[in-house]
Amino acid sequence: MIVVKAGGRTLLNNMDEIVKSISRLEKAVFVHGGGDLVDEWERKMGMEPQFKVSASGIKFRYTDEKELEVFVAVLGGLLNKKIVASFASYGRGAVGLTGADGPSVIAERKKKVIVQEKVGERLVKRAIAGGYTGKIKEVKTDLIKALVERGLVPVVAPIALSPEGELLNVNGDQMAAELAKALSAEYLVLLTDVPGVLMDGKVVPEIKSSEAEEVAKKVGPGMNIKIIMAGRVASGGTKVVICDGTVPDPLKCLEERSGTWVVP
């Protein structure tokens, strides 16, 4: 079993190659982002996307009720079904779903979040309402396993369900990591728009899971959460690679051992 995750920018720029590469796998689950497309649709509707930075330096989309509606419609609907259609064009059956289906992914709605903001020259931390953002608490694998066993590729949008029945925006990298752990996946592949984790302009070939959180502090928003999640998954025995999703046949990184590998 291989779990693959691609962020929105990477996916939108190279969907055919990513889907074609996954289509060759016997057993695969695909988790997708799509924030850029959400931003585009929000602006069409006269809304401005909201982003915050957590106290730990993780950039995230702040999701109020109106933004949640667009997020679910675009990621759980339009983009998700475009990906399913792309799989069909390569002769591979796929089923589009979210973590709310089943339900497969249960998350706790964040009541408050601590964010950091620049006020003049100072970095100030303050608490704000959590909106419709969730932290994953439980993964139920029955539905996803059943689809995989039938030779289908589950295409999962990063939307979870709260115990109270609320739809929640969850981080796509966390969604992929939690699914990989729950499914005891052999590999978790995080496709991004750079060749791997970069330091001083060079790809870091390997990171130990015990060092992941420290390394994450040295890289920018977007990559830091990938490294943190990769470290947590790798510590459980799943092989994790962060590699270039913009190239032809991006999953060749598994054979070539390219990109950045996160190891126990």
UniProtKB/Swiss-Prot annotation:
<keyword id="KW-0808">Transferase</keyword>
<comment type="similarity">
    <text>Belongs to the acetylglutamate kinase family. LysZ subfamily.</text>
</comment>
<feature type="site" description="Transition state stabilizer">
    <location>
        <position position="5"/>
    </location>
</feature>
<dbReference type="GO" id="GO:0003991">
    <property type="term" value="F:acetylglutamate kinase activity"/>
</dbReference>
<feature type="binding site">
    <location>
        <position position="169"/>
    </location>
    <ligand>
        <name>substrate</name>
    </ligand>
</feature>
<dbReference type="GO" id="GO:0005737">
    <property type="term" value="C:cytoplasm"/>
</dbReference>
<comment type="function">
    <text>Involved in both the arginine and lysine biosynthetic pathways. Phosphorylates the LysW-bound precursors glutamate (for arginine biosynthesis), respectively alpha-aminoadipate (for lysine biosynthesis).</text>
</comment>
<dbReference type="GO" id="GO:0043744">
    <property type="term" value="F:N2-acetyl-L-aminoadipate kinase activity"/>
</dbReference>
<dbReference type="InterPro" id="IPR036393">
    <property type="entry name" value="AceGlu_kinase-like_sf"/>
</dbReference>
<keyword id="KW-0457">Lysine biosynthesis</keyword>
<keyword id="KW-0067">ATP-binding</keyword>
<dbReference type="InterPro" id="IPR001048">
    <property type="entry name" value="Asp/Glu/Uridylate_kinase"/>
</dbReference>
<keyword id="KW-0028">Amino-acid biosynthesis</keyword>
<protein>
    <recommendedName>
        <fullName>Putative [LysW]-aminoadipate/[LysW]-glutamate kinase</fullName>
        <ecNumber>2.7.2.17</ecNumber>
        <ecNumber>2.7.2.19</ecNumber>
    </recommendedName>
</protein>
<dbReference type="GO" id="GO:0006526">
    <property type="term" value="P:L-arginine biosynthetic process"/>
</dbReference>
<dbReference type="InterPro" id="IPR037529">
    <property type="entry name" value="LysZ"/>
</dbReference>
<comment type="pathway">
    <text>Amino-acid biosynthesis; L-arginine biosynthesis.</text>
</comment>
<dbReference type="GO" id="GO:0019878">
    <property type="term" value="P:lysine biosynthetic process via aminoadipic acid"/>
</dbReference>
<dbReference type="GO" id="GO:0005524">
    <property type="term" value="F:ATP binding"/>
</dbReference>
<feature type="site" description="Transition state stabilizer">
    <location>
        <position position="226"/>
    </location>
</feature>
<keyword id="KW-0547">Nucleotide-binding</keyword>
<dbReference type="InterPro" id="IPR004662">
    <property type="entry name" value="AcgluKinase_fam"/>
</dbReference>
<keyword id="KW-0963">Cytoplasm</keyword>
<keyword id="KW-0418">Kinase</keyword>
<feature type="binding site">
    <location>
        <position position="61"/>
    </location>
    <ligand>
        <name>substrate</name>
    </ligand>
</feature>
<dbReference type="Pfam" id="PF00696">
    <property type="entry name" value="AA_kinase"/>
</dbReference>
<feature type="binding site">
    <location>
        <begin position="34"/>
        <end position="35"/>
    </location>
    <ligand>
        <name>substrate</name>
    </ligand>
</feature>
<keyword id="KW-0055">Arginine biosynthesis</keyword>
<comment type="pathway">
    <text>Amino-acid biosynthesis; L-lysine biosynthesis via AAA pathway; L-lysine from L-alpha-aminoadipate (Thermus route): step 2/5.</text>
</comment>
<dbReference type="GO" id="GO:0042450">
    <property type="term" value="P:arginine biosynthetic process via ornithine"/>
</dbReference>
